[in-house]
Every structure is written in structure tokens, then in C-alpha cells.
Amino acid sequence: TVLGLVAGGTGNDAAEALGLRVGSLEDRVDRALADPVPVDLIWTGERHAVTSCVAGFPAAVNVRAEAMRFPRGPSRYTLATLAELPGMRPGRYRLTLDGEVVELTAAVVVVANTAFFGGGMRICPDADPTDGLLDVCVVGEVGRLSLLRSFAKVRTGAHLDHPDVSMFRAAAVGIVALDARPGLRADGEPFGSLPCDLVASPGAIQVAGALTAPPGRA
């Protein structure tokens, strides 16, 4: 089965990451009828995700954004971020990365198959959806103002220069919330709760006309 994707949603992060958001509507339809390209997915043992799974502050932002009726488009996530910021508190997590255990305090944990989340933000700009690996972005024990400044840089990927941002890469990622919010979101939708085990599923889906090279920083 081949997936033909024509961007038309609020965030369009999957389409953006796979090069399917460029051009006119006619161009996008033509791309959705092009030759298939194998693309990795994230697998939990029960469900698949395409772009990323998020815990912590961005999960709360996503819930807020989905409840909003105005505005449409990526600016909804910006307003949701500002609304959730006063209640932001980093939490403790245990991550297992290909068997290696790391305990840390974090405001943000993102496990990504592709580069974009939150309506075009380059949270993991080097994520490659064909390498059989997941990119993990952790924003550590930061204050509200520092987090806001970091999020302002996510559009370009410049947040990776922040000293409290850490990047990991693994084929299998386990997440346990020690004293953090347990909610988990994936592809902008509810995705259960922590703990969870996420595994890269190589070539799990065929996407028509996909361009899979990581975008890198803007």
C-alpha cells in the first residue's frame, strides 16, 4: 500500500519533512501520485507514528493548540506555547537509549523520526526518516524565559546551540516519567501515556514522491 499525502492540515509537519508541502495544489497532487519511497516509522508495539513523539511541555502545548478554534495554521502553536508557559515545570525522566540508561531533568523530551514538529519547528533538523534511527532532543532544567528563548530558535534549528539542549540517537528509546507529566503526544494527537518504548521501524511505509533528505538548519 502506498500513501499519497497532500498537505492541508494545521501543522503539516509530515508533509514538510517529506518535501510534500512545496508548490501549488496541482504540484502537490502530482507528487502524491509519484513513485513510492520507503520511509521509517516510530513503533510502540501497538501503534505507529510518522513524525515524533513528545513529552513534557510540548505535549501540554499540543493539547492546548488542539482545543483552540482560532487562529488556523502554525500560529496556533505559538499562542498555545505562550498560554502554557506560566505552568511549565521540568520533570524527571529515565531514558533508555539502545540499552543505555540516562536519568535527567527535562522540560522537553522529543523522540523524532523526522525533523519538524509544532507546525514547522526544526526540533531535530538532522533526523533522517530512512536511517533506522530515532533522534532524541532533550531540553533540560531551564526556566520559563530560557525555554521561551529556545523555542524562538527552534524554527531554524539554532536551539541546538543552547547549553541545556542535548541530542541523542538510538534505534530503541524507552521513556519513564519519574516525577513528570505522563502524557504522550505523537503527530499532534493523543498517544497514550508514559512509560513507553519507542522503536524505529525501517521502511515501514511507502510514501509517494517523498523527499527524505534531512533539511538541516535553516
Predicted regions and their residues:
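ATP/nucleoside-binding phosphotransfer catalytic cores, i.e., glycine-rich phosphate-binding loops
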Residues: 97-103, 128, 138-218
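Short beta-strand-to-turn element immediately C-terminal to the catalytic PLP-Schiff-base lysine
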Residues: 44, 64, 111, 139-140, ...
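A generic structural signal for short beta-strands and their flanking turns/coil linkers
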Residues: 89-91, 105-107, 130-135, 169-171
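Short acidic/glycine-rich loop or secondary-structure boundary segments that cap or lie
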Residues: 58-61, 103-105, 117-120, 144-148
